[in-house]
Amino acid sequence: NTAALNESRISAVLGLSVPFFPRGKISTIDLFKKIYQGKFFYQLYFQEEGVAEAEFEENIRKYLELTYFSIDARGMRFQKENAINASSKGPNARYLDGIPEFDTYPSWMTNEDMDYLVSEFENSGMRGPLNRYRAQQIDFEDLLELTDAKIKQPSAFLTGKYDPVNFLSLIHI
């Protein structure tokens, strides 16, 4: 959105993992409610304030380990090979339900790294990061000028083979 709103100040765009989508006719939250009706979807789970916070803050280390390690290449490969998909969970599931656990840390994460993250989130809590998801409806209402917006600057989108965004296809729903 920054590039579409500030064309003269942004010379190029590189998107990582999350592709750009212009503002549509309905909000992404309303779209997700239609697409995932009767199914679990993490962004809908995050909407009710306090629910995800309570689950994650119960054991921040477990939340971080399960989240990070289930969506890295090893975790996504495991989920693909075992036909595990978050949309197969019911609408009343919790976020951590059914997420695969691993006995070892991947090479890109050390115990010291995890200790630091746990310490930071124990101090700040999870509300701030989750509020970004909750602001989607506000963005939809406030950014009418982004309807059908296009990124006019030179741009590229980069994703990895096992990036979770590649598995959010409607085919899986």
Language model features: what each stretch is:
Residues 2-170:
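Flexible "cap/lid" subdomain of the alpha/beta-hydrolase fold that forms the substrate-access gate
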